[in-house]
């Protein structure tokens, strides 16, 4: 009965979360070249320059409320369909879904309202620019949840920051500490990469799941606000992905990469938004 109810919830959540295509007036630029994730991931991790943290400015759930915010939190988000590439910092997002998908940028410690968001057509890639020194995360989602003024922390995070004091060097990782709603792959121009693309959201043991506000069942967060570990989802992430590729918690692995040219590329297989 539990499995039957879970299946019904998954179907209902998936239907509720399907986005409406923006349509011909979206003003989306032509797609950039799409990625070849198999080629990117063919580079062995022994050849990848990795860091446990490096210069990455990360969101810390146990300290966030006490931090002075480097940015003013947004009162309303900025919608883009794809930014002009003027040579500054930013990331490309390759949406591998067959349909439009939404991606939401949050400043660190600003959880209620995204700073910027973008809808990208299926099988296309767009560039999103960020200011010098930007630090935050990107999540997949839908407007009904991500733009409702409430924090939506549950899910996979692309954590990214740029160090303005050191040539605006970029740092990035994929974190599953606040949950896992699907794969993210991130890489730099040197071929260093982290993240995963395989589907890992089905078949996890009891205690590994949590429900997003839109009804989607995803892998639960691995760390609580007090820093204690939820071992069932953490161990599932280790088993299916590995701590050398993602943050499964704050104690394992070296899943951070850096870029000297202010740019990261990302590939997003379909998940549960």
State where each predicted segment sits:
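Extracellular low-complexity, O-glycosylation-prone Ser/Thr/Pro/Gly-rich "stalks"
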Residues: 18-273
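Cleavable N-terminal signal peptides of Sec/SRP-targeted secreted and luminal proteins
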Residues: 2-17
């Amino acid at each position: 009965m539990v499995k039957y109810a879970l299946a019904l919830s998954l179907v209902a959540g998936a239907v509720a979360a399907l986005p409406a295509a923006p349509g011909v007036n979206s003003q989306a630029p032509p797609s950039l070249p799409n990625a070849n994730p198999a080629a990117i991931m063919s580079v062995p991790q022994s050849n990848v320059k990795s860091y446990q943290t490096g210069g990455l400015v990360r969101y810390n759930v146990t300290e966030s409320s006490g931090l002075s915010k480097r940015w003013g939190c947004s009162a309303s988000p900025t919608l883009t369909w794809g930014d002009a590439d003027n040579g500054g910092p930013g990331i490309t997002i390759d949406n591998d879904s067959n349909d439009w998908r939404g991606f939401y940028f949050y400043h660190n410690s600003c959880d209620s309202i995204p700073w910027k968001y973008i809808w990208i057509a299926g099988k296309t890639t767009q560039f999103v620019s960020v200011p010098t020194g930007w630090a935050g995360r990107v999540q997949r989602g839908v407007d009904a949840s991500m733009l409702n003024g409430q924090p939506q922390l549950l899910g996979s995070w692309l954590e990214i920051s740029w160090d303005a004091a050191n040539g605006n060097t970029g740092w990035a990782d994929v974190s599953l500490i606040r949950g896992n709603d699907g794969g993210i792959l991130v890489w730099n121009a040197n071929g260093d990469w982290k993240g995963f693309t395989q589907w890992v959201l089905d078949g996890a043991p009891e205690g590994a799941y949590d429900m997003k506000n839109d009804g989607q069942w995803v892998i639960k967060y691995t760390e609580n606000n007090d820093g204690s570990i939820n071992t069932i989802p953490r161990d599932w992430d280790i088993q299916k992905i590995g701590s050398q590729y993602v943050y499964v918690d704050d104690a394992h692995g070296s899943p951070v990469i850096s870029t000297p040219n202010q740019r990261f590329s990302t590939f997003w297989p379909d998940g549960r938004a």
